[in-house]
Amino acid sequence: MIVLKWLFLTISPCDAAEPWQLGSQDAATPIMQGIIDLHHDIFFFLILILVFVLWILVRALWHFHYKKNAIPQRIVHGTTIEILRTIFPCFISIFIVEPSFALALDDAAEALFPNTAPTPSNTSSSEDSFGLRVLSEPWPITRNLGLESSICNRIRLLEAANSPFLLGKEKGQYWGEIQECLYNVSEQREYYRLLDFENRDLQIRERKHSCLEVFRGVLLRNPYLEERAAYSPQEAFFDFLNERRDALDISNPGSSPAEMDRLEILFLGEIERDLLRRGDESLYIKQLLGD
């Protein structure tokens, strides 16, 4: 019984590979099903080519023997047979790749003429091809869950502190919009680009909030500074940060947005350190509120 089970029952009902198993497990995705179909199609034509070529070779070797066929025949040892056994596999190969050519033609036509509807012949040939099924299958995006979680937690800290740098949005709304954008991307490169942008943007907002908290502390310890301000110190602080960002953009023409964001982060860190170290004697206090 064990021997019979080992010989015949080698295909697992739960689609797990077994020793000496013949054939593939049932496909769980369209991509795997396409791979299995392609395997079967290719081997069908390979067997045809193998049988045809072997028959020609064996026949040629058999008739080449001087005792079997003393008078050479042109069909066996001539140009005709060489042409036939060369052209026949070529036609088979063309027949195999024809759906791929049709798919490439459809893609080129769609790129050159996006408003042109595909013809029925192109549609029927391309829809049945394995390449179309593979290309239409969406590739999963590998998510950086660690960085996403970090961004979410940092936004919650700013929300808990009622930071004015979250554009006045309700709690959870800012992260919800970012998360929706991240989940709607269709390419891995676009996901990384968007995630890096959101991380840099949040770093800038965190730096601005930290500078504002230090600035408020300086004002609380030195009430006379508010009297020197031409208008609201907080509004003056916001205007000062915007002006410095504009100055960075003007002084660094041709720089990428990522590089400009890094320069702004460094500048905000410099402001925070100077306010902490020098307090009301800080150079930036004088620029904000006047001498």
Swiss-Prot record:
This is Uncharacterized mitochondrial protein AtMg01280. InterPro entries: CcO_II, Cyt_c_oxidase_su2_TM_dom, Cyt_c_oxidase_su2_TM_sf. The keyword Plastid does not apply. Pfam families: COX2_TM (PF02790). The chain crosses the membrane at residues 42-62, 86-106. It is found in: Mitochondrion membrane. Keywords: Membrane, Mitochondrion, Transmembrane, Transmembrane helix. GO terms for cellular component: mitochondrial membrane. Belongs to the cytochrome c oxidase subunit 2 family. GO terms for biological process: electron transport chain.
